[in-house]
């Protein structure tokens, strides 16, 4: 809303390209918006819906025709230009809404959950189309979504927000691999990251994460921040993603200092993989294994955590403790 100019900026400066736009009217910011409801004019054809904003600008007729047909070609709408919105499918209507934005050739596209009204299959197809469109236009897209799959698959950079406060700005891979805090860690990834209460204990110069059910030796490279910030002897939260818990004998046999036992409470076969719902002592854990593993309720499994993929979070602030200086989430 602040980028579009619909709400005043309380602090800081907003640039679009090299232009400071804090005090520029919304209509003069050269922004196009696409919403989840397509907001098409029902009495106008696809062509006229796409041309509407250009006609308001008093653009020459031949230039309007050229822009509409170029956008229609990009979006595969050429054969639909004479139809009314009621004769179109949901995906086609959304493409028309995109086309209406494209013909304006804006500096920024603002997209507010544009796919949320579509069914799952169509949403997947449109996700690909919008990504291709972004690559071909080379224009900045700012895309609001609650769907982490859309964020991970489409974004060059993700801004994760909670209650209006930025939690992390990073590439999808870094958001996934190095979350700043427990909110980001739990929000991105399905099934979500496991969070386990542990106490950090030092033995023979090594640091272990321990509780009633497990004792995991931490990777030496992760211990500097724990020691220098006084976490030894304190309770923290251990985070581990389901795919970083291993059942394979070769991994378990080579990870004796990060093994633990757990009982199977439920197995959900997803085809290529199986989600194992486990209990280790009083701790509920989800692991993701190859779908060919046969799991039976009540089985006792010997498992190993990939200690290079373990995350440690402060129990009170929920901020990740890493080698860089421990800091509060930026506000």
Which ranges hold each PLM region?
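Helix-to-loop junction immediately C-terminal to a conserved catalytic motif
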Residues: 4
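A position-specific signal in ABC ATPase nucleotide-binding domains
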Residues: 7-8, 15, 55
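Conserved coupling/switch loops of ABC nucleotide-binding domains, chiefly the family-specific signature
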Residues: 10-13, 63, 163, 310
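Conserved ABC transporter NBD signature motif
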Residues: 12-20
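ABC ATPase nucleotide-binding domains
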Residues: 24-187
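C-terminal boundary and immediately downstream tail of ABC-type ATPase nucleotide-binding domains
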Residues: 178-203, 306
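Glycine/charge-rich catalytic "coupling/switch" loops of P-loop NTPases
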Residues: 206-265, 293-331
């Amino acid at each position: 809303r602040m980028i579009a100019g619909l709400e005043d900026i309380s602090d800081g400066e907003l640039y679009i390209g090299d232009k400071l736009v804090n005090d520029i009217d919304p209509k003069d910011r050269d922004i196009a918006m696409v919403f989840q409801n397509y907001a098409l004019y029902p009495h106008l054809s696809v062509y006229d819906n796409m041309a509407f904003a250009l006609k308001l600008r008093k653009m020459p007729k031949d230039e309007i025709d050229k822009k509409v047909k170029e956008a229609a070609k990009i979006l595969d709408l050429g054969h639909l230009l004479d139809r009314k919105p009621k004769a179109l499918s949901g995906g086609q209507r959304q493409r028309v809404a995109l086309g209406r934005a494209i013909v304006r050739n804006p500096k920024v596209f603002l997209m507010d959950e544009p796919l949320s009204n579509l069914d799952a299959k169509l949403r997947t197809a449109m996700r690909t189309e919008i990504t291709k469109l972004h690559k071909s236009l080379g224009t900045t897209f700012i895309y609001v979504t609650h769907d982490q799959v859309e964020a991970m698959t489409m974004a060059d950079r993700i801004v994760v927000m909670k209650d209006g406060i930025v939690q992390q700005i990073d590439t999808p891979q870094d958001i996934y691999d190095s979350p700043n805090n427990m909110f980001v860690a739990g929000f991105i990834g399905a099934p979500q990251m496991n969070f386990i209460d542990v106490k950090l204990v030092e033995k023979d110069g090594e640091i272990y994460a321990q509780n009633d059910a497990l004792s995991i030796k931490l990777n030496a490279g992760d211990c500097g921040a724990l020691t220098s910030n006084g976490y030894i002897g304190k309770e923290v939260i251990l985070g581990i993603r389901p795919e970083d818990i291993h059942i394979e004998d070769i991994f378990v046999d080579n990870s004796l200092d990060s093994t633990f036992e757990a009982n199977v409470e439920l197995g959900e076969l997803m085809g290529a993989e199986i989600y194992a719902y486990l209990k280790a002592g009083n701790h509920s854990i989800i692991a993701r294994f190859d779908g060919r593993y046969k799991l039976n309720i009540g089985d006792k499994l010997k498992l190993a955590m990939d200690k290079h993929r373990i995350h440690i979070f402060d129990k009170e602030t929920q901020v990740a403790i890493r080698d860089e200086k421990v800091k509060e989430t930026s506000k």
